[in-house]
């Protein structure tokens, strides 16, 4: 079977197309940064380690990303006074502003790709992805 017909090769190409479109529309915000900001917005003061899943990264990579975001004024982090190993994260006013502007753009990029499928196909696609991830 030709490589172009392999499922994961096709998925990688699709992901690369989506990433290129994302970077074109939101050049100052990576998809992992966006996901982390959405998670923080959903739960202000979230513990830093709880963001690993949202960032789809390691603890070290997440810490580096949050440090860069903190330097840009997008997030603030505070240590737990009772346990200095724990850190909690909030969006700053600037982070909230950036995220509010990014959400409709991110949604439109996703819709550009998902819109190629009917509503029924989108449901099936999500079911299949969840099934493969949870197997």
From Swiss-Prot:
DNA-binding region extent: 48-71
Residue span, HTH marR-type domain: 4-134
SMART domains: HTH_MARR
Keywords in alphabetical order: DNA-binding, Transcription, Transcription regulation, Virulence
A Gene Ontology molecular function term of the record: DNA-binding transcription factor activity
InterPro entries: HTH_MarR-typ (IPR000835), Tscrpt_reg_MarR-type_CS (IPR023187), WH-like_DNA-bd_sf (IPR036388), WH_DNA-bd_sf (IPR036390)
Transmembrane segments: none
Keyword Acetylation: no
PANTHER family the UniProt entry points to: TRANSCRIPTIONAL REGULATOR, MARR (PTHR42756), TRANSCRIPTIONAL REPRESSOR OF EMRAB OPERON (PTHR42756:SF1)
Function: Involved in the temperature-dependent positive control of flagellum-driven swimming motility and cellular aggregation. Regulates fliC expression by directly interacting with fliC promoter.
UniProt-recorded name of the protein: Transcriptional regulator HosA
């Amino acid at each position: 079977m030709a490589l172009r017909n392999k499922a994961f090769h096709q998925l990688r190409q699709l992901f690369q197309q989506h990433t290129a479109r994302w970077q074109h529309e939101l050049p100052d915000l990576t998809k992992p940064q966006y996901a982390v900001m959405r998670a923080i917005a959903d739960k202000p003061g979230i513990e830093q380690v709880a963001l690993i899943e949202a960032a789809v990264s390691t603890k070290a990579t997440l810490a580096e990303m949050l440090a860069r975001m903190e330097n840009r004024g997008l997030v603030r982090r505070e240590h737990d006074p009772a346990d200095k190993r724990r850190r909690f994260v909030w969006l700053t006013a600037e982070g909230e502003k950036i995220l509010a502007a990014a959400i409709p753009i991110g949604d439109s990029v996703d819709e550009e790709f998902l819109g190629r499928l009917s509503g029924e196909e989108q449901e099936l696609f999500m079911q299949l992805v969840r099934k493969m991830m949870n197997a």
